[in-house]
């Protein structure tokens, strides 16, 4: 297990699944790109390190919410 910093937030590898909620698609996409960029810059294979990563769109009672799922 290892802790990496993405957009000022510490993430621990080895986590089963993490769900992060955003208020805009742009924020969710930027977050995803930041993770990929970090893995590329540190020579960690994206496919090898992340089990999956996808952006999900859901509409709830409070309006639109964008969620980013990633798995180490």
Label every PLM stretch briefly.
Residues 37-72:
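Short, mixed-charge low-complexity intrinsically disordered segments
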Residues 12, 21, 56-60:
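Alpha-helical interaction segments
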Residues 3, 25-29, 68-72:
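A broadly tuned "polar low-complexity/structure-edge" signature
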Residues 17-20, 66-68:
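Short beta-strand segments
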Residues 1-18:
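Short aromatic-glycine-(Arg/Gly/Cys) micro-motifs in beta-strand/loop hairpins
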Residues 5, 25-26, 50, 55:
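Short, intrinsically disordered, low-complexity terminal segments
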Residues 12-14, 23-48:
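A short, charged, amphipathic alpha-helix used as a generic interaction element across diverse proteins
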